[in-house]
């Protein structure tokens, strides 16, 4: 091995190499500087364009020229990466305040990377870029050598507004990343002015001004204010954006999409659900976007009965119509170190940067003014002694020392006199020189006054911030509206909600008819079969069947055959126990309370949802004593309703329905006491059950007789649950009972 070779442990070399690479990526590639809000490549592009004279009023120039200058002079990396960074700064849908004004194909919201090659596009700086460049060259920036040491480039640009917040940025470094969202210029400028006026301003006071991020889209930010506050307090979090939609002629029109969301991709996502039959209520999709309406996506429902609010809620949960954006306010501070900062820290530190920039600008200008005043003093001497000055210049071999010695002027003043052309000497006028002197002395005093007074400096900072906010500011684009969390619909929710009537025959054949105006008994039945029951509901509600053993089953109406035919046997869809038949059928809302009972005198309260069993074999709902039967389920409208029980022997008992327990299944509690011996012999059992509103009147039909029981008469049969009841003569063979309630109409959705 050569003596010149350096021996180094491998682990030390790799550690140092990785650390050096990490620091390079963090400091020189991925993270923005808090002062101008730019990464190095962005800064170099903007500076190179300014050096090419491509300001907002210049003619457009080929983008390849700019990229070539950037790569050749400042940024020795790939041309495609450099051009892509330039494209992003030119896209109004990517940057809140674009830095580059592009001509040609610079991509589209649907496909941001569809931009043309740099040999085809042309560009120049936008008007907004003046905020970063206008004070350059006024002593405001530190300059560093470029990569090959042949020229200088600015270490940062003297931004007049907090561009770090206005345009934001994203980047992935080594071991860290940054995701800074864009904000509204007027809000940020106002917050900065407030912080100058009141240095002790709190974060909450700033958040009254800076409402939240402001993306280059009209989509809504739906994150709650409390969560947004946490983001700006901790410097980390996420916000959610949701598309904006309206109804037009029954269809949904989406007019704004979340940031960087492609309308074409959204339509593909919705179409995929339609192909997979997960959106049966949507009939058609259209993209009607054009130059006048950059975003116009149309979703057409199958009918005007479709709940489009529910459909959109589902699409928000399952497509990019709602999107989350990570926020990580990580940046390189004034100390040169990367750190995650909160909103108050960012604005405070940027104001320190801005204050230093303005101070440097004023000092630079003051130095220029003082130099000019010094020269004017010398020129004034020359004017007052014009003949002697001319004589010295004509006669002396070294006129500069002679002038300095004769008039007591400095070398700079003597050089200024000697550099004047004769025609200028002839035009020198004392009033003109003194006029310029007076103006510059006023400016000098003004500059020195501002530099010496913090109050005057603050006034200047506020004035400049307000002027820039007025010149470049605009209204907020992304409104903040708190919305409920979107939830995807289940298969059950996706079923169309249309009125249907389910018809059951005596032989157990079932069918579904559209609408509620159906003459169920008058339908066509198989030979030997006839009508048994009908129930009305919606097509997206399950229909529940209860068999003679107390088991319950549920079927979606959409799976049932049409009423145009004679239906299908339930045994093809359900697996009933041997010898069991379907006894009852009902459709209600999921939370509707029902009374389930057996003729053995037991019962309980449950909800309709407790009856739903999707499997073929169903589930045990009510436990029946030997030889007992299931009574028809009864709807409970109000917790104050009364339950009236009538036995075969004519005994009546009435008590509050809330005396019964609420169960999901079981035998229940005793409603009315029926002696087991009589029940076993069939001499007695529960014959009738009614849920009555208070103050109801009953008309009981026994043969040709009518027995009317008014509220005061019904009070005689009121007792505790489980009692024997009161024996009412002549009520052993009740044909039917009519209920007259002054408070509400009784349920009439089922026929049996």
Swiss-Prot record:
The record marks 39, 75, 77 as: Interaction with DNA. Residues 31-494 form the Topo IIA-type catalytic domain. This is DNA topoisomerase 4 subunit A. HAMAP family: ParC_type1 (MF_00936). Its EC number is 5.6.2.2. The record marks 119 as: Transition state stabilizer. The lineage of its organism: Bacteria, Pseudomonadati, Pseudomonadota, Gammaproteobacteria, Enterobacterales. It catalyses: ATP-dependent breakage, passage and rejoining of double-stranded DNA. Heterotetramer composed of ParC and ParE. The active site is at 120 (o-(5'-phospho-dna)-tyrosine intermediate). GO terms for biological process: chromosome segregation; DNA topological change. GO terms for molecular function: ATP binding; DNA binding; DNA topoisomerase type II (double strand cut, ATP-hydrolyzing) activity. SMART domains: TOP4c. It is an enzyme of class 5 (isomerase). Pfam families: DNA_gyraseA_C, DNA_topoisoIV. The keyword Isomerase applies. One of its GO terms (cellular component) is DNA topoisomerase type II (double strand cut, ATP-hydrolyzing) complex.
